């Protein structure tokens, strides 16, 4: 445009436009750099140095040079540089950078300490368990930085649009400069000027710069709230989720089993039933066994236990001193021809028999997480059409949890492969164009996470398996983080659409004005650089979400 202005003899305008354009480009570059720095700072959880004890001395070195098994010292106000286990010291850790939670977490000797957490109160001596590159902070930042390589459909559309749009407007600008003088016989100077004005206005920078920046900012804003999104394609997919399928245990419920009732029979007391159950389960590592032993709460003399047999799918039989104890489900009672009373309450039931006589039943339940019910309500409020729960537990447990949380559907007594089948069935029924998300623990649900449009793993903090398995990782065990993720996704898409409308709308008006000779080169530069700055500043709003 500047060359064109020189050609047609508009020397002052040529110089002025060049200066104005450079000023505009400077502010545009400044806005883009600042926005990217804001996002990078948001995710800057990697410490620059580590204090290591070597040969009886404390030295400060780069975290990359610390080996696994070395002792590091972290003072109050310092970030933990590598993952490890606390050898000595008590402190409160600010985990906000990893989880988005403002409530500090207390750590003591033997507790896990994750890199990226800010030490607040006491001096900690930590034995490293992972190298710097494999530590939590490094993995999180690598995931977020690599997320830009997975582009959203809207980003791909803008890239494709710009590929065709640019040559088209160049041709139109050439036609505008050449055809009217030839056809209408008018002077060349005015139409060449209009052609260059048209060309400057039509530059697609506002879209090409602001749209990817908005998605990058959305991923940064999500990470600030303890949600890792592995790509802008998944962020946009979250915006279109209409069906969310939850695994039950560890997702909607705590996954911690507790004895909630003991129903004795045939003259046995509650204490006797619990003691017999504890004797039977004393060698088992199953969560049900642990809950019974925790409820018993006494030291178990395992020397009196003999002839221990674990009967797969049925239960356990043992000799406890002179007593023959059976502990298991109704199938075990039926197999041993023991008459028993069926417990109708919802929960996991352990039936007990001693020396062939039915002794009673122990009821064990998994507690629903405090924020699960509100999460389901909030999801429906922000536009999720259907919430579904899948569980391997029996029908009564599934129904009880589903009714308590007011879920739309539930499916119980499912094996892992059956969960995949149910997700495929639900996927086929969802609204056309919408997405299905599955939320699980990221460890036992890998096949279902892979099958869903968006796989969401919960409790990713310190869990490599969860981070690897899913498209979106909720760093804590709170279901409410899912609402945060979708809200950020919707806000991101809203800003993207605003920028598209702003850029195309303003440019369309200025293109018409330029073609008619109403808009000059000053307006043209604003129509390009000015609109880009407006779009970039609008994109920055996502960091406030």
Model-derived regions, located:
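Actuator/coupling domain of P-type ATPases
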Residues: 1-49, 53, 65-72, 79, ...
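Membrane-embedded alpha-helical bundles of multi-pass transporters
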Residues: 4, 8, 221, 383-384, ...
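Residue-level signature of catalytic and energy-coupling elements of molecular machines
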Residues: 10, 31, 50, 69, ...
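Juxtamembrane helix-loop transition segments at the membrane interface in multi-pass membrane proteins
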Residues: 27-41, 213-232, 540-545
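Cytosolic catalytic headpiece
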Residues: 41-42, 55, 232-454, 487-490
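Conserved cytosolic headpiece of P-type ATPases
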Residues: 50, 61, 70, 82-83, ...
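A short beta-strand structural signal in non-transmembrane regions
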Residues: 124-130, 350, 388, 471
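Bilayer-spanning, highly hydrophobic alpha-helical transmembrane segments
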Residues: 156-185, 194-215, 497-526
């Amino acid at each position: 445009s500047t060359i064109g202005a020189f050609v047609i003899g508009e020397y002052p305008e040529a110089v002025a436009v060049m200066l104005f354009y450079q000023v505009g480009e400077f502010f545009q570059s400044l806005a883009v750099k600042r926005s990217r720095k804001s996002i990078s700072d948001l995710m800057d959880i990697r410490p620059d140095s580590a204090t290591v004890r070597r040969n009886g001395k404390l030295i400060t070195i780069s975290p990359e040079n610390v080996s696994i098994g070395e002792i590091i010292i972290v003072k109050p106000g310092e970030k933990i540089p590598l993952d490890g286990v606390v050898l000595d010291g008590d402190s409160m850790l600010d985990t906000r950078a990893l989880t988005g939670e403002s409530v500090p977490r207390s750590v003591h000797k033997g507790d896990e300490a994750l890199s990226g957490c800010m030490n607040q109160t006491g001096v900690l001596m930590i034995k490293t368990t992972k190298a710097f590159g494999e530590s939590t902070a490094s993995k999180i930042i690598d995931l977020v930085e690599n997320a830009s390589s997975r582009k959203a459909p809207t980003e791909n559309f803008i890239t494709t649009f710009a590929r065709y749009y640019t040559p088209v407007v160049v041709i139109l600008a050439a036609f505008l400069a050449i055809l009217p003088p030839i056809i209408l016989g008018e002077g060349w100077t005015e139409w060449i000027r209009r052609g260059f004005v048209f060309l400057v206005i039509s530059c697609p920078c506002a879209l090409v710069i602001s749209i990817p920046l908005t998605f990058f900012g959305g991923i940064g804003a999500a990470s600030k709230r303890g949600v890792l999104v592995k790509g802008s394609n998944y962020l946009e997919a979250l915006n279109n989720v209409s069906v969310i399928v939850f695994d039950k245990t560890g997702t909607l419920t705590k996954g911690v089993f507790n004895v909630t009732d003991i129903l004795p029979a045939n003259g046995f007391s509650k204490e006797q039933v619990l003691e017999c159950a504890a004797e039977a389960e004393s060698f088992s590592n199953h969560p049900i066994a642990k809950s019974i032993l925790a409820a018993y709460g006494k030291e178990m003399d395992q020397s009196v236990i003999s002839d221990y047999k674990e009967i797969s799918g049925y239960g356990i039989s043992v000799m406890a001193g002179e007593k023959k104890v059976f502990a298991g489900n109704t199938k075990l009672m039926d197999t041993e021809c023991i008459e028993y009373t069926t417990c109708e309450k919802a929960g996991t039931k352990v039936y007990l028999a001693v020396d062939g006589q039915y002794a009673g039943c122990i009821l064990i339940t998994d507690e629903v997480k405090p924020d699960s019910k509100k999460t389901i309500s909030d999801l429906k409020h922000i536009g999720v059409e259907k919430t579904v729960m899948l569980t391997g537990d029996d029908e009564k447990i599934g129904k009880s949890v589903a009714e308590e949380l007011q879920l739309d559907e539930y499916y119980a007594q499912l094996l892992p492969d059956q969960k995949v089948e149910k997700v495929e069935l639900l996927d086929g029924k969802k609204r056309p164009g919408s997405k299905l998300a599955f939320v699980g623990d990221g460890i036992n649900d890998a096949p279902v996470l892979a099958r869903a449009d968006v796989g969401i793993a919960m409790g990713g903090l310190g869990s490599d398996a969860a981070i690897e398995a899913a498209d979106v990782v909720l760093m804590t065990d709170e279901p409410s983080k899912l609402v945060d993720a979708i809200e950020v996704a919707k806000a991101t898409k809203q800003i993207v659409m605003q920028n598209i409308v702003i850029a195309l709308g303003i440019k369309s008006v200025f293109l018409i004005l330029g073609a008619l000779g109403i808009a000059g080169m000053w307006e043209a530069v604003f129509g390009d650089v000015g609109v880009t700055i407006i779009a970039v500043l609008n994109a920055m709003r996502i960091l406030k979400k």
